[in-house]
């Protein structure tokens, strides 16, 4: 991470203030302040990893995934016979916190800060799937988009999407 002396001073002061405002994490902020003030290149790379970039297309895919899960839930509720499918299978489980952090962060922004999709967000605390889900969700999206009536899915269509 390349920074001018002025930028480093501003960031170091911000870390100092964060340490004062958040005593529980003061040690973490003091470490970060020291790294920035010292200009330690190796550790500055660590800071750069905190700034994730998620493309517009990736954001759209996350939103489409949430919309697909909404459609699955609505369609399930409208089924006359639910005996071959449990509601548990329709639960969105989130993204892997280690390998899919940028998607998980965007998901948390959309559901937490923006307050969208709250009606069906029942994933485990933090929505950490603990296994990569991006490719699975993309396969599911392809199946869902191929359905003629995306919000009036049959039992077979729901199962095909879930099994993609």
Swiss-Prot record:
Gene3D superfamilies the UniProt entry points to: Helix hairpin bin (1.10.287.680), yfbu gene product, domain 2 (1.10.3190.10)
Signal sequence, start to end: none
InterPro entries tied to this protein: UPF0304_YfbU, YfbU_alpha-helical_sf, YfbU_helix-hairpin_sf
Domain of life: Bacteria
NCBIfam families: PRK05445.1
Similarity comment: family membership: Belongs to the UPF0304 family.
Protein name: UPF0304 protein MS2240
Organism: Mannheimia succiniciproducens (strain KCTC 0769BP / MBEL55E)
């Amino acid at each position: 991470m390349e920074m001018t002396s002025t930028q480093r001073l501003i960031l170091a002061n911000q870390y100092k203030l964060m340490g004062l405002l958040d005593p529980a994490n003061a040690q973490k902020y003091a470490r970060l302040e020291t790294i920035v003030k010292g200009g330690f290149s190796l550790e500055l790379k660590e800071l750069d990893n905190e700034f994730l970039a998620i493309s517009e297309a990736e954001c759209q895919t996350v939103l489409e995934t949430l919309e697909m899960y909404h459609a699955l839930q609505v369609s399930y509720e409208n089924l006359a016979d639910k005996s071959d499918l449990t509601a548990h299978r329709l639960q969105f489980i989130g993204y892997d916190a280690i390998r899919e952090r940028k998607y998980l962060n965007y998901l948390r922004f959309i559901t937490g800060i923006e307050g969208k999709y709250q009606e069906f967000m029942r994933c485990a605390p933090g929505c950490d799937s603990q296994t990569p889900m991006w490719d699975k969700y993309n396969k599911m999206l392809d199946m869902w988009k191929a359905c003629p009536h995306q919000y009036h899915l049959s039992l077979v269509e729901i199962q095909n999407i879930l099994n993609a």
